[in-house]
Amino acid sequence: MNSPNESDGMSGREPSLGILPRTPLHSIPVAVEVKPVLPGAMPSSMGGGGGGSPSPVELRGALAGPMDPALREQQLQQELLVLKQQQQLQKQLLFAEFQKQHDHLTRQHEVQLQKHLKQQQEMLAAKRQQELEQQRQREQQRQEELEKQRLEQQLLILRNKEKSKESAIASTEVKLRLQEFLLSKSKEPTPGGLNHSLPQHPKCWGAHHASLDQSSPPQSGPPGTPPSYKLPLLGPYDSRDDFPLRKTASEPNLKVRSRLKQKVAERRSSPLLRRKDGTVISTFKKRAVEITGTGPGVSSVCNSAPGSGPSSPNSSHSTIAENGFTGSVPNIPTEMIPQHRALPLDSSPNQFSLYTSPSLPNISLGLQATVTVTNSHLTASPKLSTQQEAERQALQSLRQGGTLTGKFMSTSSIPGCLLGVALEGDTSPHGHASLLQHVCSWTGRQQSTLIAVPLHGQSPLVTGERVATSMRTVGKLPRHRPLSRTQSSPLPQSPQALQQLVMQQQHQQFLEKQKQQQMQLGKILTKTGELSRQPTTHPEETEEELTEQQEALLGEGALTIPREGSTESESTQEDLEEEEEEEEEEEEDCIQVKDEDGESGPDEGPDLEESSAGYKKLFADAQQLQPLQVYQAPLSLATVPHQALGRTQSSPAAPGSMKSPTDQPTVVKHLFTTGVVYDTFMLKHQCMCGNTHVHPEHAGRIQSIWSRLQETGLLGKCERIRGRKATLDEIQTVHSEYHTLLYGTSPLNRQKLDSKKLLGPISQKMYAMLPCGGIGVDSDTVWNEMHSSSAVRMAVGCLVELAFKVAAGELKNGFAIIRPPGHHAEESTAMGFCFFNSVAITAKLLQQKLSVGKVLIVDWDIHHGNGTQQAFYNDPSVLYISLHRYDNGNFFPGSGAPEEVGGGPGVGYNVNVAWTGGVDPPIGDVEYLTAFRTVVMPIAQEFSPDVVLVSAGFDAVEGHLSPLGGYSVTARCFGHLTRQLMTLAGGRVVLALEGGHDLTAICDASEACVSALLSVELQPLDEAVLQQKPSVNAVATLEKVIEIQSKHWSCVQRFAAGLGCSLREAQTGEKEEAETVSAMALLSVGAEQAQAVATQEHSPRPAEEPMEQEPAL
């Protein structure tokens, strides 16, 4: 019925109407304009012969023509229906877009509301915190005001008190002591003798006793003031002169003593009191009495039994030593008394009464041998200027890492005999032993750290002379010059002077103790074999640290006798000899200082200079043997023979007692097996809170591993290597000088370093207060100011020693049981339990000192070794491969993306197998073995390293929770990974313990790795593991790694297709591939043989042709 024109018109409308359904949903505007457009698609059944629906124009044109009304009505209804459907569709689209925009705006509004609420909460919290702080400050101010008012009221009450009231109320114990003492003294008859009347007469009890323990009266006055100085008259007298005793007997009159003390302080014109007969000795010049004789005349100057006379700093040369002999103080100028009042040697010593001047530091000397050291007190000078100067010096000492001395050393006491440093030649050895006994008892009571004073420094007490031979070993008593040589010495107000004196005595005590320890070790060490290589000495190592190492060594040696030829016994003797060298070097330094001044005694210098010169020459020759060639047994300092412990019987050693370097060269011998290094010194790095449960990285980690190796018998198959502390120069191969001094020094050795270099690190050292009460670099990296620096240096040194022996061919491989870990430590940053990067430092030193060409570092700790990657990111000679949990940067430390492949010339030498996908499912044995099969081993074999270092962190072993692990690798798997790495670098593999905090897990993994290193047969993997396929997340990770690394290592490309295979399928495929290659090789060899036979048949061989010239089969 429709005309062709109508059909054409409909077809022409179809493209314009067909645009609407293809419009994207998001491109429809919010306000849609609905136009009355008729649909362009009509049912095919509505048309006539044309098969199309007429357009509105055609319909309007068709109205003029004749048409069936029913059909026309039906057509209009269809068009209206289609139009309604189109409009309904447009409404739905409009509503959908509206709903989408509404949801979007709703979410934005919710986010804005949450952000606003969060800001309001933060503001409220800050306001609350500020209010609490203000309230606390107001409370503190109120408390201070109340305290101030209370003190003012007390002061007002004291000022307005009546004279009849008591100044102080003595305790019941003091009252009883005084009463018993007075009763006992009142019953005793007063002797009239001159020689020994002082200790028995009640008038002189104050000068004979010096504490409440000896029934002395209570000390009045505020703390810190000098003790009262009694005025004993040293001759017979009557009861009219007994005024002080009667006054001090009654309690209300105790304040009289303070008045007497004030009078004594004001009357400073003369150190000698007037005698009753009017005889006066030079009241205008303060001069000391010179003692020109010895023997009884000297000991009788103080008019008392030996050890009981009074003394003062101005006349301390007359101090009676503990055994009655005269001690000398080289810091007090000594002059003759005026000529009109010279003191004859045979005169009665009770003519003079001496007292101490309160203007100087007062030390009570001349104690009896039975009196404890607490009876001698060091008091501060009441002068304000002297006190300020001492405070300034103490603060400066603290800034430099020293300790407080003098009046700042808490409330402890210093023996009075410490000032008597220079003993005369005829002094009894018993006096010297008792002097050491006093020093030992004094140092044992110190709550603070040991006094750290440079032993090589010049003593401030001896400015006119250099350090005497008191620095010798204890074999000889020190000799000093007479008192006439010390006229230019300063007064002893300086705390550094007392420090130097104490340190000299401590040094002598240390040497004596060391000789005894060496003699005890002699019986064990004489049965050992050759000496091992001697580690490098460290000038900054202190005697305290060496003593601790020796004590630990004695504890081990007493339990087990080392087998013959073991490195444990060799290194023991080696350490003792190293300490001897350090002591003699210190003595040598002191002697050279004296020679520069030209005042050394003629009988002291030559023998010491001769012995030290010979000893120095011996080690100068030995140091020429230090350069080592790679993979050859090194010539160490141990090749220089020593007369082992025999030298310690006499000190200093004479040149004749030492053998020449060429007499009996000793060859270093090691069992060619696995080396293990461990040192108990690393156990001292721990938090000051002492609670290991809140600190995952604690000393029990390496203790447990060491015990496991002993229990299983693996340790007996290994060669134990003696560790050492790494030097600061070695640490600076990777870390900055600032970082090295910051964490590589402690108050024990900081004094021997340059103070200018230490000024920055020490002043800017910042610590964080941990919730446990200790301190740390951050919230988890704890720090111990006394021991952490030595422990972290010991960890580095142990690994360096072990790696050097493996690289030089002395050992087959090695396992370092060290802590704290190091692979997180960057050039100037400590983090993640790490301070110094042990593995990176070892790799650098192997290249610098042993000329190792290429080093492979494999890090299978679950955390990425950001410090190691940073150290070698641009170095093509070190290949770093890390397998770690990455999770797209959401796992600590957040670095180690697969795209990090190196920089500059080191592009391609940094490989990160960064596991992603979390712990659902956790990465296990299959994934690690697949990574080794497809990525690690192919790249490592193509790199062909000379030495392999492994950062063996075991926190991927099952048993570690998600924050510190979360994976389920078995300990057995790490043994198989170690066995694969042993096929590289000729087996020169060294494992260093890194992370791992579950004790059972790390012990099992360490046992498996050491078993693999010892070539012990490992337990086979479970069949389920061999049949299991890697997880989807692991396959995706390995595919990405291969895609990135195939640009630099073509060997990994062929493994991309088999990543989803199980280990059993991969082994089968590799076996078939190997058989195919072998068959092809056999076919080619057979063809060559046939060709060679045919050639031989056609050209006979001459008879004289040698066999070597036959064609190779």
From Swiss-Prot:
Listed Low complexity bias regions: 484-494
Active site: H824
Positions bound to Zn(2+): C687, C689, H695, C772
Matches recorded under SUPFAM superfamilies: Arginase/deacetylase
Catalytic activity entry: N(6)-acetyl-L-lysyl-[histone] + H2O = L-lysyl-[histone] + acetate
Cross-link entry Glycyl lysine isopeptide (Lys-Gly) (interchain with G-Cter in SUMO2), positions: K35
Enzyme Commission designation: 3.5.1.98
Residues with PTM Phosphothreonine: T283
Name of the molecule in the record: Histone deacetylase 5
Native species: Mus musculus
High-level lineage: Eukaryota, Metazoa, Chordata, Craniata, Vertebrata
